[in-house]
Amino acid sequence: HEPGSTFKLMSMVAALEDKVIKPSDLIDTGNGEILFFGKHKVRDSRKGGYGKISVSKVFEVSSNTGMVKIINDNYKNNPENFVDRLYNMRLHKILDIPIIGEARPKIPYPSDPDWDGLDLPWMAFGYGVSITPLQTLTFYNAIANNGVMIKPKFIHKIGRLGAKPHKTYKSEILNPSICSKETLNAVQEMMFNVVEKKWGTANNIKDEMFSIAGKTGTCQIDYTTNSIEYISSFVGYFPADKPKYSCIVLIHKPNKLKGYYGSIVAAPVFKQIAKKIYSAIPKEIPVNLKDLKSNSTNSLL
């Protein structure tokens, strides 16, 4: 399916790697609307737009117009450069997981017969492309893993409980480095701010016990019909400072009367999953050795 705003991470990484922008650059989102060819409109969820904001904040507030300006303004004369960067990050290939039926990603290329003037700006915020949730998660996991893209693994080892395993499956590296350390640091901070900063689209799931980094997504489906539906999503990792787990949540066709934005529908589910996992992790408790008596028994958990 079309991923919507969760694909903005891929677009942002591409633009930063090509050095067409810097995180501190200002982007004019105007009144929150851009019109293409007199009838195709890109709009922000916030009416009136965000005015002039930094590249980082474009990501953190999930501005569609801001992301379109970043990508379209810098690549419209050479869209191949943008798509080639996506291809270099392996976004056009299947993961080749041991489950039958994995869909092949659709990343349009400028030489395709049906490429038109809307493809580039629409790709910037996750439309006109198609990628599975697991493929999306694998990319986000690479960001958490300092740029190393690892093939999803469903079985680590096989053996009897308590005995030495008779078979162990090694991790397979799909891409040893999807981007530079500079770009990694920049997007990791943006993803952290999505949750941490008051203007971030997922600030509602900020937790005092542990930090979360991620991105919200709200993708229209069936938008060529009279009945528009949505896929709400949140994808990220935690703890943000020392990532150990990554997760993606998608809610298909949520009740629009109760809400359909990824921040409202999917992000709280992510938080509940994260809290459940985090609460099960044994915590290290600092102990002063001077307080331990040599002739006494101490139990530490």
Model-found features: residue ranges?
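Short, gly/Ser/Thr-rich active-site loops of penicillin-recognizing serine hydrolases
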Residues: 165-173, 264-301
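Short beta-strands and strand-coil junctions in structured, solvent-facing domains, enriched
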Residues: 256-257
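Beta-lactam-recognizing serine transpeptidase/beta-lactamase-like catalytic domain environment
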Residues: 1-5, 10-253, 262, 297-301
